[in-house]
């Protein structure tokens, strides 16, 4: 069996500025699959609807992953499956953005703070207003499908150790991150398929959760291991409260999002070390 949940909490910097939470997360479960998402709307001034962009990204990836059939793994190669998923996810997200823009175009109030140069760029590409990262994972039988664009991550968990499911992005200009809203998003949306039988679980999170720990080793020991123990003990309320505290007090002021899907009944000896 699989135990799973996601949690998003607003960061204290957004509380101070009276800004809404720009992260979004969701989980979906049925008899065949479990899906978790963690999306981070960009904080730059041009991304005036990033809180919606992150929601659309989460909805898009859940919708597309729900359509994957077990027979697809026999009909197509893993490369073909990944390429098809990549295209479908981006098309779904862009369709949601276009529909929202058609129903409610950018208002003067939303763009009042922008310089003429940034306003011009936004008018040329209004989908930039919805800029967001996307991290998601689906347990599907004995397969694990991982999806990521931008910072944050999808993290594999096995016997108390963790590893990135997808490689880190190369350094970008001015420390920016790749985004669902960029024209070449297809080139940067990464998808990988693993055999889940070799793993204990999978984690998705935004950078607001990872960054306060400064290293993956510290993140593993101070966050992942204790969380895995708590979720096996059914202490989700404690996990929920801790993630809220990271956003409001402990972290760097950014919104924080965390999701986990983990096998039940596994040996926890290595998580207690």
In which residue ranges do the predicted regions lie?
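Short helix/loop capping segments that flank catalytic or ligand/cofactor-binding pockets
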Residues: 46-47, 147, 156-157, 212-214, ...
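Short hydrophobic beta-strand that contains or immediately precedes a catalytic carboxylate
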Residues: 36-40, 147-149, 203-205
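Catalytic core of PPM/PP2C metal-dependent serine/threonine phosphatase domains
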Residues: 74-155, 189-196
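Short acidic-glycine loop/turn motifs at beta-strand connectors
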Residues: 29-32, 139-142, 150, 157-161, ...
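Helix-loop-helix
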Residues: 59-101, 217, 221-245
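N-terminal entry segment of metal-dependent catalytic domains or homologous docking segments
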Residues: 1-67, 152, 184-186, 191-193, ...
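PP2C/PPM family metal-dependent serine/threonine protein phosphatase catalytic domain
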Residues: 5-19, 107-127, 131-132, 156-197, ...
């Amino acid at each position: 069996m699989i135990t799973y949940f996601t949690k998003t909490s607003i960061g204290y910097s957004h509380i101070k500025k009276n800004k809404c939470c720009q992260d979004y997360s969701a989980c979906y479960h049925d008899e065949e699959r479990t899906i978790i998402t963690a999306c981070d709307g960009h904080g730059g001034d041009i991304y005036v609807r990033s809180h919606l962009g992150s929601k659309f990204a989460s909805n898009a990836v859940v919708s597309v992953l729900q359509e994957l059939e077990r027979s697809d793994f026999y009909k197509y190669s893993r490369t073909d499956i990944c390429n098809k998923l990549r295209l479908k996810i981006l098309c779904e997200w862009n369709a949601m953005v276009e529909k929202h823009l058609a129903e409610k175009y950018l208002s003067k109030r939303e763009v009042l703070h922008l310089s003429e140069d940034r306003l011009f760029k936004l008018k040329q590409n209004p989908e930039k207003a919805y800029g967001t990262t996307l991290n998601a994972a689906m347990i599907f039988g004995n397969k694990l499908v991982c999806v990521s664009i931008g910072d944050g991550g999808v993290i594999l968990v096995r016997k108390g150790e963790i590893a990135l499911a997808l490689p880190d992005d190369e350094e970008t200009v001015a420390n920016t991150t790749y985004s669902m809203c960029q024209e070449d998003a297809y080139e940067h949306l990464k998808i990988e398929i693993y055999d889940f039988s070799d793993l204990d679980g999978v984690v998705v999170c935004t950078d607001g959760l990872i960054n306060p720990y400064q290293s993956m080793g510290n993140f593993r020991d101070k966050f992942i291991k204790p969380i895995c123990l708590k979720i096996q003990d059914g202490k989700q309320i404690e996990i929920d409260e801790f993630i809220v505290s990271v956003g409001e007090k402990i972290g760097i002021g950014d919104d924080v999002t965390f999701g986990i899907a983990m096998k039940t009944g596994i040996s926890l000896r290595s998580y207690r070390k």
